[in-house]
Amino acid sequence: MGKDVIIACDFASKEETLNFLDKFTGKKPFVKIGMELFYAEGPQIVKDLKARGHKIFLDLKLHDIPNTVKKSMAVLSKLDVDMTNLHAAGTISMMEGALEGLTRPDGTRPLLIAVTQLTSTDQERMENDLLIKEPIDKVVMHYAHNASVAGLDGVVCSPLEAGKVHETCGEKFLTVTPGVRFADGDIGDQKRVMTPAEAKKIGSDYIVVGRPITAAADPVKAYERCCDEFIG
């Protein structure tokens, strides 16, 4: 898969999700299914969207003991998603177990991406809430390195860190970047953001965009604007 815009379908129900996606006549955008929608609708929402032709990033951010994550990933691998993720803070052994569980008997598997630090986290929150005193960019690079050592395909990171991740882990190591907003848009609860054009320039491989598309007066037009700015 090449560069792409992933729409964060952070809706509460299947009905809302399908009503939104029905607006994209003739288009099958890459979509992210997060906790709210997955927990509300279960695995069937993944099957339904796959049947409609969408690529899917299943964003559940697993973080548990290695054996539990391994077994959970073995279940998720049967859903035929295109990408899924976990928290890099779960350690290298957890990530290795996840990769093993996700790999099917024929050797195929979805892309596995590690979350470094959430884009809602800034230096102050990291120091005060998590008692991590290192600079946030150093923590992100450390987590990215660990994910690379574990054999993962890439990381979720702020677009501010995508270039450094490629420098640290190589150009083929994927960067999936939320925290993307239009220059004339509201940044919401994100702390570390860039525009689609800036994310392209700095080297992001995928951008995850939610409210700037889903809450737009014309979501299709907003999606096309994202694609124009990011993919060209």
Q: Where are the predicted features?
A:
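Conserved anion-binding
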Residues: 2, 68-72, 77-153, 161, ...
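Short, acidic/polar
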Residues: 12-24, 67-75, 134-146, 191-198
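Structural motif
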Residues: 26, 52, 79, 150, ...
